[in-house]
């Protein structure tokens, strides 16, 4: 779980494995702040240009920034780029890195938040990493999630990466202006090399699956015997789908979102919760399509997470899709699914999910129950959702 003020975790997630450097990086975001985009090439440049004694040569650093910018391609929704008031010369190096994408159809969004990276060592060997997040590439001050998976170098078999490969392969099709030939070749090379990748899974996880949403992609099954839904934006029909069947469902959202859907879609949830307004400053009262606006930082809850128990398995989904009709009915999105055994595997996943939250300042990770005005730690919400 990303603290609203935490940028360190993203920078660490971009850090190459030992004795490796960045070869290719492809990212996606809905809104894009060009100054935030600089974090990526500057981070890679610092990793590669820093001397053993901890010092870096200024000219070498600038050259490393330019070189790494040539290896990074970011797709974002057209018209959703925040340009700084004072243009910095270094931003010119990012000009070809940014690829605007047209909305998939009127009323829908290009909304995924993904990084797929390939690193290379001097021997020409590759290592891959994928980051699936709910945070845009901006300076938002919001509560978000991120999943980071590295390639397992000792694996003798591969995961089913076809959905992720197809997602990357389709990105250029919606571009307002196609990437340069060099960048398109990088994307094609990355798609091909992902074919045989096996991911290192968190303790307690048995499988990983990728779920592109939008277009002709099929939806994941988010229904189950018991579930927990965390989403800042809601729609009634999606809530009724998520709570269909089973005997216990919990929902965490924003107060304005809960009020907007009315009581009927909430009948399927045993309890509903909002972020404690005494702990954090919540988001503004704006609908989903207008909330993530260019140049206006998000605040409050922005994480999207679906925790579902079916039989003896627990399924944890997180990524960019809100619990809305747009999120599961037309937006371009991507979720990652971690499958764990029950109950031990689930409990380990919960511990990993909330470990960062537990180290925040007192009170900042609390949720308030609307119906009973209870204040409950996030960890207890997750555990209670499956009766552990």
Language-model segment annotations:
Residues 1-226, 231-369, 374, 378-380, ...:
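PLD/PLD-like phosphodiesterase catalytic module centered on the HKD motif
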